[in-house]
Amino acid sequence: TLAAAHMRAIGCVLPDSQRATIVSVLTQRVALRLRGTRFKPRTLVELPARAVHEVDLLWSVCSGLSFANPVQGKLVQLWHLRRALALGERRRVAMALALEVGHMTSTSSAAHPRAEAMAARAHEVAVQAGDEFVIGLVEACGGLSDFLIGRWSRADQRMKAGLRRMRDHGVGGRWEIDLTELFYLANLFYCGQLRELARLAPLFLREAEDRGDVYAQNGIRAWRPNVAWLVMGKPEDARAHSLAVAMEHGSDGEAFQLNDYNHLLSNTRIDLYVGDGDGALARVEHAWRELESSMLLRVTTVYVESYFLLGTAALASTRPDRAAVVRRAIAGLAKTKLPWADGLRALLVAGLTLHEGSRERAALELVAAEDKLRAAEMPLHVQIARQCRGELLGGAAGAALREAAAAWLRDQAVADPQAFARLI
């Protein structure tokens, strides 16, 4: 590609294989830890234009590549950060540190304390640079870091604050705002703020159309925010949005990438919403080998979402072997020691228990799931678990649980609570 050619010209050559890329990432990560984030501050007038151009080129490549091929994006980001530190121009250093914050937690929640320290360092440098937009970017990247490990409330606060500051001071920074808006919308689903999601997704889409911003349009229509149309009870619109983007940017022969994952997630959710469990499971299983080989499952959110999607689709299907598929999904989620993964795993355990014929045990498993999901700050999922428990209990107590859950969903502008519950 043109970007790869430009990078080769400055001595940055992407490896030919995913394995070699991972080795290079680890090597660069060790080099960065040994080097640290210290730098000698310099102003633009002190710097050769070529060196500044090289840092800007790497920023441009890594900021886009990170959301197409995260493994390659991580490598380019490490090149970018080390060169920005060597350059010493405060604004570029702060931006490179901010982007690194998100990368640090993308594959490991254990890195979160280091990511917080990196965010504090980025904020310090951004303040020294006196750049309000970059301060907002640092806040937003901190929110992205929280999103990637399932800290939904904190992610909501930080991304909202970052968006506000970037919009107020963002001359020429539209891409960073676009990306933050996409993750902010995705986070609203997990926060249970569905009314706000249904309000903002069409609004952001109209704004993107008005300014001719194709990247933002595609992200809202076909990525995680696509679920907003299911909140509104419009599965046909949700499908049309996703398929239109897929047709405009269809397969070009390249390996399975993040766009393909987003298409899988959105369309499987639509399958579940309309009650096509067999179609949902077939869709996930058809894509699974490519998903695994892409190494996207190294990204924690993709890993958790994918295994939960697999298990949910299996529970909704009529396949004779569905119990084995659910067990596989439960085992996959058990490997990730995150509160939200534990809560989603508990939902699958309850579903499997019911499938095996024990309503009483399934109801008890749902109580455990509610507790775990509440601890993970996932009120939507708590309400769906409560609704399911009400259906199992029956009688006046069960009816009260069902009615309370349905009222909560209606208050969140969910047009069809019963259909929406199938997603979870």
Give each language-model segment a name:
Residues 322-385:
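Generic long, charged, amphipathic alpha-helical segments
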Residues 56, 60, 99, 134, ...:
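"A position-specific structural signal for the A-helix of alpha-solenoid helical repeats
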Residues 1-75, 106-117, 154, 174-178, ...:
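Amphipathic helix-loop-helix modules that constitute alpha-helical solenoid scaffolds
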Residues 107-210:
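Hydrophobic, small-residue-rich alpha-helical packing segments that form membrane-like cores
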Residues 53-68, 78-82, 94-108, 137-148:
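Non-membrane alpha-helical segments in proteins
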Residues 4-15, 81-85, 120-130, 160-171, ...:
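Amphipathic alpha-helical segments of tetratricopeptide repeats
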Residues 65, 97, 104-105, 139, ...:
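Residue at a conserved register position within TPR or TPR-like alpha-solenoid repeats
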Residues 68, 87, 107-109, 149, ...:
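Structural motif corresponding to the intra-repeat A-B loop/turn of tetratricopeptide repeats
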